[in-house]
Amino acid sequence: MSEVISIRVRRGLKKELEELGINYAEAVRKFLEELVARERRRRALERARALREELRKKGAFPPSAELIREDRDEASR
């Protein structure tokens, strides 16, 4: 099922789009789909960063220096 979204554009823009053979309906559809995908990724990244920070505060992640020291100690053996 689909929905209808209507927009107003400056005078003459629709005519220019038609003269240039631009399928504006398809272009707007594609833009809106990309906009939704971008926003979903942005929000997922925001949630992941917040979760990582929360876990870091609870001590779930050792400090980077400790991890580097462990790697170097193992490599020198």
From Swiss-Prot:
InterPro entries: VapB3-like (IPR039709). The keyword Coiled coil applies. The keyword Coiled coil applies. Residues 10-60 form a coiled coil. Forms a complex with putative toxin VapC3, possibly VapB(2)-VapC(2). Antitoxin component of a type II toxin-antitoxin (TA) system. This is Putative antitoxin VapB3.
